[in-house]
Amino acid sequence: MKPEPRTLPPSPNWYCSRCSDAAPGGIFGFAARTSVFLVRVGPGAGASPGAPPFRVVGELVGHTERVSGFTFSHHPGQYNLCATSSDDGTVKVWDVETKTVVTEHTLHQHTISALHWSPTVKDLIVSGDEKGVVFCYWLNRNDSQHLFTEPRTIFCLTCSPHHENLVAIGYKDGIVVIIDISKKGEVIHRLRGHDDEIHSIAWCPLSGEDCLSISQEENSEEPDIPNGKLIAETPITKGCYLATGSKDQTIRIWSCSRGRGVMVLKLPFLKRRSGGVDPTVKERLWLTLHWPKNQPTQLVSSCFGGELLLWDLTQSWRRKYTLFSTSAEGHNHSRIVFNLCSLKTEDGKQLLLSTSMDRDVKCWDMATLECCWTLPSLGGFAYSLAFSPVDVGSLAIGVGDGMIRVWNTLSIKNNYDVKNFWQGVKSKVTALCWHPNKEGCLAFGTDDGKVGLYDTCSNKPPQISSTYHKKTVYRLAWGPPVPPMSLGGEGDRPSLTLYSCGGEGVVLQHNPWKLSGEAFDINKLVRDTNSIRYKLPVHTEISWKGDGKVLALGNEDGSIEIFQVPNLRLLCTIQQHHKLVNAIVWHHEHGSRPELSCLLASGSNNAVIYVHNLKAVLESNPESPITITEPYRTLSGHTAKITSLAWSPHHDGRLVSACYDGTAQVWDALREEPLFNFRGHRGRLLCVAWSPVDPECIYSGADDFCVYRWLTSMQDHSRPPQGKKCIELEKKRLSQFKPKLKKKKKPTLRLPVKQDSSVGNEDESVKENSGPAENGLSDQDGEEEAQEPELPPSPVVCVEPVSCTDICSGFEKSKVTVSSKATSLKKEPAKEKPEALLKKRKARSMLPLSTSLDHRSKEELHRDCLVLATATHAKAELNEDVSADLEERFHLGLFTDRATLYRMMETEGKGHLESGHPELFHQLMLWKGDLKGVLQAAAERGELTDSLVAVAPVAGYSVWLWAVEAFAKQLCFQDQYVKAASYLLSIHKVYEAVELLKSNHLYREAIAVAKARLRPEDPVLKELYLSWGSILERDGHYAIAAKCYLGATSAYDAAKVLARKGDAASLRTAAELAAIAGEHELAASLALRCAQELLLMKNWVGAQEALGLHESLQGQRLVFCLLELLCRHLEEKQPLEVRGPSSIYHQWATGSEGTLVQRVTGVWRSAFSVDTPEQCQAALQKLQDVKYPSATSNTPFRQLLLHVCHDLTLAMLSQQAAAWEEAVPALLQAVVRSYTSGNFTLMQEIYSAFLPGGCDHLRDKLGDLSPAMAAYKSLEAFCIYGQLYEVWWSLCGPGPESSVWVLSAESTVSDKQSKPEDSASAEDMEQPPGPGPRLSAESERLLSACKELFSERHASLQTSQRTVAEVQETLAEMIRQHQKSQLCKATTNGPSRDEPSRDEPSQEAERAPSQPPSPTEERNAPVSLPELTRRLTEANERIAEFPESVKAWPFPDVLECCLVLLHIGSQCPDAVDPEMQQQAQELLHKYGHTRAYRRHCQSRHT
């Protein structure tokens, strides 16, 4: 059984009464998010020698929401069974050995809050929910019982260890009841005393009440009456003690025989070792209990700040307790403890395990009360991993819980030696980067845009940069300073500065010596240095080359830009990805092949990884930027976006990738082969890092809150999952914790959600379960981000575009506030029926209260008349009685003086407001003539109307201005932004109106207003176009975005955004647009991409039309012409099964007159007007700037054909221009591409079509002293090599062209007629000679020319190269075997020494075809490291002695040719010159000692 990968698990769930438990077999489990993690504890854990005896051994996966309860069965024979409860409403029973569900039930209708496996009944599981319902479930008989005792929220429950029918239940309000489940839940005791939540209940491990000598008098705080009402006398013969812990900061001991409390223990206020006591401690207290089985007189409890207390219950009057871990500083929990459970190990140790809010699981020795070990955990996504280049083995982990972990992965004494850093972070840590030279200097970036530096070797708080990113920090990198920071002397500036890339697309350069200073945006330097006029792309990734001379920037549009220091001059742009670039990594500098340091791997939101070789670009240092459209290697296999990449520091060209498909993949990038696939995560991978000390060890982090350490050789899979497996992984991911918060689409850039550090672990789990953060802008993949908890609905507040000014002297300046009850837009009234048109609704009365008072009884009306008469005819002032009457009869103000009338109108106005008719109140105020008061009151209440604003000019111009501004602000609260902008325009606030529309994403309206009211050259208009274009581009509306960029006179950006779609139509339109705008380089690159897309669709006509859009692509048109004719030629010779779209050929491609070369030159002359040497030379110069990577066996055939035709076009143009020294290397390059890709047929077609008469005429053209003579010899050798194989295969049976080589073939037809690979297999070499056919004269002439293949210099060079490769392979195998042996020693459940490891047979099987095994005694003979070093040194010295002319050009394998010739001689003895046979045998004898030819040579000699 292979060992489990080492795991940093998710944090145990918070605020659950029982979320961890331990079984007597040495298994401890704790609930974390939607799973349960299992930890093997004790000597049998299989931990490393000297390390603490524990190991994470597995995970129980099956719930879809948070696990709220976990309990083991403590009955002999079923220690492997456990039960879990979850917020998904299920209770599951598991087998921890198989990690599968045994059974489950969904009886609860509400959230389950408590769970326990009865310690006395082996198949009884009791659970309770938030509504007070208890279910008893008997596992063996699949039976259940429903109990509803109290309509209260259950917080915890515990079954009695002494009486099988008793269960103690604690409620949220502090009540504790003991029920008898055999009597339908009858309450035996109701225990009152606590006044807050019951967090934990623990039964005394001993039955009876003799273990504690507690008298009633001892409990001075308890009255001499029963604590709580005793419902009924219990028939229990023996009593028992019960302990309860509550949020009210007390522990109470209860007597079950008396039904009352006998002891109260108050938690002490301890001085926290990390600081003072938090005044809000009661709100955060969780008081959990554990009553040790072998210590009935002692009780363990948690305390305020994470301390653990051991209470001595025999001395209750002294309240005696002992603190855990009093001697060791920092070994206590730093925050409250939630769960305690005990475990007895195989060696007899009594341990206590605790889980806490500080995200640590701790193990305590009950004998010494000291901490034995700590298992750290993660409370958020693992966003970033980074190994320190100085302190090797220190792995920094950026986590979404607002903390940085530094894991010492090389610690011998502790496999989980982790330090936490949280000061100054306060948000999700999304990026990390160690300083390359300074120990302990760690840079970090967060989701709120913060960049800081931590000194991990000290306890100092971090330094924080004063310059924040507007969005999430996605990448950090240390690099050389660039202007303006690089200006000055050596001592005035740091040697390395910190670069950060944020989600808004900006890269900032920070001075680590002065983070309080301003950081610089490198875009300004890029723009100035390269004279860029167009909009710079949004940057999403940054990576410095190891030597610090080159910077790579990944962009949101999928492009990658390469810059050269010190001024960031643009060298080239890589146009390969079509979506946001998430990861860029340079190959390390310390490999055995220095040229590999120029490899750049990149991953994006597409599932394909591209590797580019920039060696030619960096060495040539082009004057103007070039565009690269072809990758050096393509790594395909993932099925989702790539999030992280890392090169192996131990291998050449080995890469590991992390992907959203839930797997990490190891690649051999040079061979384009997948090697190992890790599928241990249950979520989407976010980061990956290769161990700097172990070649097989890789660390990966994901959104499942886990970091795994895994070994490549222990993986069962070699490539990412495909087909149904992808669907299963997606279902598994979706089955995780389901968010309870409402999700909504975020209108801005993709960011991690900001979280509150005081929120519980489960709440954070909800937030973290949304899509993780990624570099740059969100892609159109339907992802949503969880938002912060929603607040009650409130009016939308707009950006304040106006400011209230004094309207006039004496008019008080008022602060306009709008009530949340602001009036909304009224809907248009429904159209009335025709018959109803005649019956209009009567207008509402302006003075309804006065009118109603005039319709009272006759007596009251008469009394009104008398009061009115008295008031009007009074000669002096009114007496008190008359004044009181007038106050009461306010409606008489209509008939008295103005003051009384105002009072009447005020009363009527209040009535209108109370009845919800403020417009009538406003009219009354207008009648009074108080227009300013009306406007001010309406503005304060948010009740301004169009009519009020319309009459505002009556009060003056300043009043009108103020009223319009206030009304516009009110309209913003009512989401009527367009109307608000119209009012702002009415007072000539054009800029404010435009800004209002823009800030509310009404770009179309804003542009219309700006275009109509502002000058055409106003920068606001261009900014509007660019802002709207960016948003449209982010949302995938590329065509409309292009219009915006065109409106902003940025045609370059318009063409770029159109091309982002990547289809042929979009690329063609973008190319045409760029050509119209005069962006010729961009037009050429887009036209070429369009032609390549059409090439995949076999649309040759469309491809030529696309290339014809730009004159500089004349050379590419010739390449595509040759490619079309070659494909047509191959189809005519070998008709293939038609798959996909049918080919659309030109008319000139259908003819068959003449040879292929004649047809090509004819079409060039007639269709493309390429006839003269000058024209050929011009086309040649354009094509020579295009470089394609070398081919491999995994190169797609269509891509191989394109590259081969490019080389053939160069050769033909060179011939027509009489440049023979360039023609021969180009022709050789085409042959070598076919040879290295393993396509022997294509290689032979090249010779038959382009060199039908052989290579002799090329020798005459070159001359013996030509520099290209070495290339000619290689070309001639490959020609003979191919013909040699055709002669050999023709001996096996009559093929289509066997008559050329064989006159009479008597041998039977065999499988050799099938298309062979580029070399003979071992079986072919070993075949006995058949009947001897007679070779033709042409064959004999060829065999006599084979002496050109028997080049001793090339044989010696190839042998030295094979020796180097074999030594390197042997060294790598020695390292692997050593690590495997160490792993087997350290892992008890690993493969035994007598059994071969899992991957050995596959390795032997892989070696079988190409590396035959050597003799047994030689294979088993060990080779020392000094001997291997000597062999390697000697081989490298021999290689260095060869002239460059020999090493520059490939040559057929000389020993392979010797073997083929000897086999032909064995079949046709008279056909091969004995002298040549002797020469071949001598070469084999002299140079055949390498592994590849050793067996063949020995069999040949024997």
UniProtKB/Swiss-Prot annotation:
Site residues by UniProt (Interaction with U4 snRNA): R33, R284, R335, R359, F381, W422, K426, K470, E556, K579
Record's GO cellular component terms: cytosol; Gemini of Cajal bodies; SMN complex; SMN-Gemin2 complex; SMN-Sm protein complex
Compartments, as annotated in UniProt: Nucleus, Nucleoplasm; Nucleus, Gem; Cytoplasm
Keywords per UniProt: Coiled coil, Cytoplasm, Isopeptide bond, mRNA processing, mRNA splicing, Nucleus, Phosphoprotein, Protein biosynthesis, Repeat, RNA-binding, Translation regulation, Ubl conjugation, WD repeat
Compositional bias segments (type: Polar residues): 1380-1391
One GO BP: translation
Annotated stretches, region: Disordered: 740-797, 819-838, 1309-1338, 1378-1427
Positions of modified residues (Phosphoserine): S48, S624, S757, S770, S778, S845
Positions with biased composition (Basic and acidic residues): 825-838, 1392-1407
Region Important for interaction with U1 snRNA: start-end pairs: 1-124
Span list, region Interaction with U4 snRNA: 13-15
Any Pfam family hit: Beta-prop_RIG_2nd
Crosslink site: Glycyl lysine isopeptide (Lys-Gly) (interchain with G-Cter in SUMO2): K754
SUPFAM superfamilies: Quinoprotein alcohol dehydrogenase-like (SSF50998), WD40 repeat-like (SSF50978)
Mapped WD repeat ranges: 62-104, 107-148, 150-189, 193-264, 280-321, 333-374, 377-417, 424-464, 468-509, 533-573, 576-622, 637-677, 680-720
Residue pairs linked by disulfide bridges in the UniProt entry: none
Domain remark from Swiss-Prot or TrEMBL: The WD repeat domain mediates binding to U1 snRNA and to U4 snRNA. The WD repeat domain also mediates binding to the 7-methylguanosine cap that is found both on mRNA and snRNA molecules. The regions that bind snRNA molecules and the isolated 7-methylguanosine cap overlap at least partially. Besides, the WD repeat domain mediates interaction with the 60S large ribosomal subunit.
PANTHER family, alphabetized: GEM-ASSOCIATED PROTEIN 5
Family: Belongs to the WD repeat gemin-5 family.
Subunit composition and interactions: Part of the core SMN complex that contains SMN1, GEMIN2/SIP1, DDX20/GEMIN3, GEMIN4, GEMIN5, GEMIN6, GEMIN7, GEMIN8 and STRAP/UNRIP. Part of the SMN-Sm complex that contains SMN1, GEMIN2/SIP1, DDX20/GEMIN3, GEMIN4, GEMIN5, GEMIN6, GEMIN7, GEMIN8, STRAP/UNRIP and the Sm proteins SNRPB, SNRPD1, SNRPD2, SNRPD3, SNRPE, SNRPF and SNRPG. Interacts directly with SMN1, SNRPB, SNRPD1, SNRPD2, SNRPD3 and SNRPE. Identified in a SMN complex that contains GEMIN2/SIP1. Interacts with cytosolic DDX20/GEMIN3 and GEMIN4. Interacts with SNRNP70 and HNRNPU.
Name of this protein: Gem-associated protein 5
